[in-house]
Amino acid sequence: KTQLVTFRVPLAPGENYLRAEAKSLSRVRARPWQMVVDFEAPKPKGKPDLYLYVVGINKYSNSKYNLNYGRPDAEAVQKALGDKLKLGAFEKVHVSGIYDLEATKENITAQFLKFSKQARPRDVFVFYYAGHGRTLKDENGNPMFYLVSSNVGALDQDKTVKKGGISGLELINYSKKIRAGKQMFLFDACESGSVAKAFARIQKDSGGHILYA
């Protein structure tokens, strides 16, 4: 059975790399189809905007998981990048910081969605996270990174982490929703190396970058 699906894709000036990939209900992937579209558009007036989103957690709902440097590191990154990048490179710098007990899954998600409605293809988006991280097995037995939000009360319970944390797959989906043509994700969290593979395709196809420590 053949089904035709239509998508509207916003194009940025210059080369745009488009890739389509289908998979069956049993998760068997078809050979991907890809093409390059060279879009000639009027040069946008003015400079791009920067969207800087920082999350740092020292205090968790379960105090035995509290950290010492999550929030200070995030605040330092916010100040350093926010101040430095205001110096002429961007038209506007939009900064959002969520810290400690305010950094719930719901609040973190809400800010991603807010920026997804504001950023334009010519803009730049930077996300920085400092806090706990866990890598668990997904339904196919593959490693999946979870950003541990402040309302996760038990790091040693996989179901609790999956319910209250934000998975690498969710982060990828937020990245796709945010239309900024240049994106960078930085993670200062345990076990965050596994998220690099999850972001590999975006990194290749859309000019995104991921750093982890």
Role assignments for model-derived ranges:
Residues 2-10, 28-39, 74, 78-123, ...:
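Functional beta-strand-loop-alpha-helix junction segments that form "active/interaction loops"
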Residues 14-18, 123-125:
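Exposed beta-strand face motif in extracellular beta-rich ectodomains
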Residues 20-24:
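Conserved structural position at the C-terminal beta-strand
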Residues 36-56, 79, 156-158:
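Low-complexity, Pro/Ser/Thr- and charge-rich linker/hinge segments at domain boundaries
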Residues 49, 106-130, 134-197:
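Caspase-like (clan CD) cysteine peptidase catalytic core
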Residues 52-63, 91-95:
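Acidic/histidine-rich, surface-exposed loop or edge segments in extracytoplasmic proteins
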Residues 56, 81, 99, 172, ...:
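Active-site-proximal C-terminal subdomain of hydrolase catalytic domains
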Residues 61-79:
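Glycine- and acidic-residue-enriched helix-capping/strand-helix junction motifs
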